[in-house]
Design a protein with these regions (language model features):
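Hydrophobic beta-strand scaffold residues
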Residues: 26, 46, 112-113, 154, ...
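NAD(P)-dependent dehydrogenase/reductase Rossmann-like domain
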Residues: 266-322
Length: 322
């Protein structure tokens, strides 16, 4: 199987690295020539353009920063789509747009899967990231061996579009967690508590979360370098808000979270790291939310292990259609 990968950014580059590490025949494409040269030095092929990549590969994976960019890339690839071609969309994108693009692929005889990832760049780097996959069951069974080279836990979410719907929900939850962690840390500092002790108390309590156990460390170190930027999270929050509005759900926290992140973006820059949002409260209180003993970057300390499918509670393994 020949695999193409478009988009070698913070997440995409690490996912593509997992394919190389697992000896997949890989060809890459990115607008950054130096990044492509680095992949070539590691054994990857280099594509001239998206159309050539689709023409030469059995599977093409995209991991891009916005729905508009994904659509533009698909416009280039579509003339080369046909029977035997598979498109895996690993970008965080709009569920209606992924269904539209998937329909175009299917009209040409190809197959499409929306399969965004979750778990952070550090887990993408080690192949331990989680993957949601939206497609019919037969297609899922066919692409599962490739997905388990990219990540550890793979969840079949249903039809095309369901994975993207769930993905933006998880990013909404992660942002809500981040903001509450920021408020908790600043309040404890103001109350005279030691921040390292505060971190540990949160970690071993009912108030812990994946975001706390990862991003709070970067906040306390001072690097705030989570490799995820405010423009990207605002895109994802907007997609989640759109889903709620489309389904007549009167959200209260979501608009507030969007306003806070927009304010952070206006203060610190469009592509500031999301963890820089702590600075709003540091500036408001005059407090420094720093502590010794925390890392500047996240390292996944779990060893890479073979990926596998996970199932919702009470669900048995389905049988693929004949």
């Amino acid at each position: 199987m020949k695999v193409g990968f478009i988009g070698l950014g913070n997440v995409g580059g690490k996912l593509a690295g997992s394919l190389l590490r697992n000896r997949i025949d890989l060809t890459v494409l990115d607008r950054n020539a130096q990044v492509m040269a680095d992949f070539a030095a590691r054994g990857a092929g280099i594509a001239e353009n998206a159309a050539a990549l689709m023409r030469e590969c059995d599977v093409v994976i995209t991991c891009l920063p916005s729905p508009a960019i994904s659509a533009a890339i698909m416009d280039e690839m579509l003339p080369e789509v046909g029977p035997g071609k598979t498109w895996l969309e690993m970008s965080t994108t709009d569920e209606a747009e992924i269904r539209r693009l998937a329909a175009l692929v299917e009209q040409k005889g190809g197959t499409a899967v929306d399969c965004p990832v979750s778990g952070g760049c550090h887990r993408a780097d080690t192949g331990n990231i989680s993957i949601f996959a939206g497609c019919d069951r037969q297609t899922f069974e066919r692409v599962l061996p490739l997905l388990t080279r990219l990540g550890r836990r793979v969840l079949h979410t249903g039809a095309v579009g369901t994975a993207s719907t769930l993905k933006v929900m998880t990013n909404y939850l992660a942002t809500a967690n981040l903001l509450t962690c920021c408020e908790a840390l600043v309040t404890m500092k103001a109350a005279g508590m030691d921040l390292a002790t505060t971190y540990e108390a949160m970690k071993i309590s009912s108030g812990t979360s994946f975001v706390h156990e990862t991003e709070s460390q970067l906040i306390l170190n001072g690097s705030r370098d989570v490799s995820f930027t405010m423009d990207l999270i605002l895109k994802d929050l907007g997609l989640f808000q759109t889903i709620a509005e489309r389904n007549n759900v009167p959200l209260e926290m979501s608009p507030m979270i969007i306003d806070i992140m927009k304010d952070g973006q206006s203060r610190y820059g469009e592509r500031a790291n999301t963890d820089d949002i702590i600075r709003r409260l540091e500036e408001a209180t005059g407090l420094s939310i720093l502590a010794e003993g925390f890392p500047a970057e996240l390292i996944d300390d779990e060893p890479e292990e073979p990926g596998y499918e996970v199932f919702p509670p009470g669900r048995a393994r389905p049988v693929a259609a004949e």
